[in-house]
């Protein structure tokens, strides 16, 4: 009897230890863009929701100099999740531009797990210069802040400028000084952008409080050239900027952004995470209008994002399962599911 009691005690201790390990909270270090950016704001809201709804995880939003720094951090095993765009994944897969030489040394491949919104990119100028600049090519030779060096929005605008032959003088400045520099005439133009065609970045809102900027749209000929070379063009409502930007419609170049967690989170948990996001989409959109596209049609956003990046990075099995259940998975992508 004594041995039996001792055995029960040992088994009980083992079970207590196992239960402790099962209930252990897993930390997720999630990289995003800099404080003041749309990506940082969005991830802060997303992780707040996930921390509440997934108590077995502890999500932390970590600001980086730019989204690609988070992609590189994940690929080198320093982060558990990243903030990545289809344009960045293209550069990574092609071993070019900001990722030139990086592919050979990375330790793991980023994966697609949650496409969040589109980002739409364009140009702003001072309102007093509206008669001076009529199209993007008029900025050739001018001082233009196209965004911080690591940022994907800058890469998108620079690629468009290169396509159009815009040979501007790139000026790197602190985001907090853009408005004053434009007001003083020390820069002639700057990057503007929106998220989900519904909101803009905090730093752009702050810029509008310091100076009176106008949107500079590409000309009809420039739009034609951009479309012929693979760019999409979308029309954004100027009311997003909460001020007059002196155009009836804003012509922007969209691309896709996602908050992508790696294979350390198993299929079942990513699937659960996506269902939580879908269920709470209205709450997310209320806290940040950047989630408007998720609220409107999360399934469509996942399909569009996957279509844009399927050739460059694989898909998390949790996202693949979720998309299959929604009837939006294409069987030709089966070989692109991450293992």
PLM-predicted stretches and their roles:
Residues 8-17:
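Bacterial N-terminal signal peptides
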Residues 41-76, 82, 245-247, 338:
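Extracytoplasmic small-molecule ligand-binding "clamshell" domains
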Residues 86-87, 95-105, 112, 125-130, ...:
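Pocket-lining segment of extracytoplasmic ligand-binding domains
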